[in-house]
Amino acid sequence: MRAWRVNSDFSRFLVELPERAPPPGGVLVRMQAAPVLSYLREVIEGRLGYSLPSAPFTPGTNGIGVVEAVGAGVYHLRPGQRVILDPHLAVDERTPEPAQILIGLTATRSSGFGGIAEVAAALQRDWPDGTLAERACMPASVLTSLPASLDGEPAARLVGLSKLAVPYGGFLRAGLQAGETVLVNGASGYFGSAAVILSVALGASRVVAAGRDRAALERLRAVAGPRVATVTLSGDRSRDTEWLVDAAGGRADLALDIVGHANTATATSACLYALRRGGRLVMMGSANVPLELGFYDMLANDWHVMGCFTYPADVPARLAALAASGQLDLGVMNVRAFPLDRLEDALEAAARMRGLDVTAVTMGAR
């Protein structure tokens, strides 16, 4: 089988590898398509400081495929099932902070303190390889069977589910309820645009899409429908707070901050101050600066500010059900697909993605 491999000098090649039987707890998947992150080139070239697997390894995070074989101790998955793969693997042991990794991408800290624990590094050594290959060997716990009603959907379209999974984790963390008003900071970005579409599908009565790219926000509103309003942020917290409150028709119930690589927290702060008493702010972005929280304002407003690393294991199944029922239209995604041997072109296209764009690598039929 063919697979992309990243070497210790960060060079990458498409090579032939022998197929192997899945180990205990593992599943061999014939890959159909895998999404390409906008920053994947930077990751696999070592420019973002991620804790990459030992080289050589196969990159790639999520994907769509068909089960070919299962290892011992796998009880529910069967050959022939179409599945969605996600990279978040956490040790299934009764410990307060289980080790976790993102397969094919990085080892992660069990908590926000200290470096990468040896147990996380060991977990990554056991499962180093991702989805940019014709076959992927994955732990059964990161696979979700897709409903038969999605069998006719092209795999390149279904990878859009992975784009939606990250903001879904944030909305679950915040406890989004139908009828609530939602602010999305970073709405013109890769995950932020997905958050806007998803919040409408989940029943938000009003969604304010906030960002700096006015044209991208207007394109998003045209697709998302009449419950979505847009705010082009100015960088002035007081002014932006006023605009957000006005667009929401009053103070909002919750805000999802999902801005990538921000060098200021002004927009995040504006979203916080646009919340009602008891409002919730979920932080999933990657700002490189502190967020100032006033003690009195936090106390007087009963605000909840929380972080969210990723999404629960049942999110792919929830999203698949929404897509199968028609509540979530994956057709709004602008998918650009490349065959496996054109990864370099896919990386270039992914780096230019905006809004609802999706870049996928395809491995064969469907």
Indicate residue ranges for each PLM-predicted region:
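C-terminal hydrophobic helical "lid"/dimerization subdomain
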Residues: 1, 169, 239, 269, ...
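Glycine-rich beta-strand-centered segment in the early N-terminal region that forms part
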Residues: 20-35, 48-109
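NAD(P)H dinucleotide-binding glycine-rich loop of Rossmann-like/cofactor-binding domains
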Residues: 90-183
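Mid-domain Rossmann-like dinucleotide-binding core that forms the NAD(H)/NADP(H) cofactor-binding site
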Residues: 141-143, 147-236
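Glycine-rich cofactor phosphate-binding loops and adjacent beta1-alpha1 units
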Residues: 200-208, 217-302
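Rossmann-fold dehydrogenase core element
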Residues: 280-282, 293-332
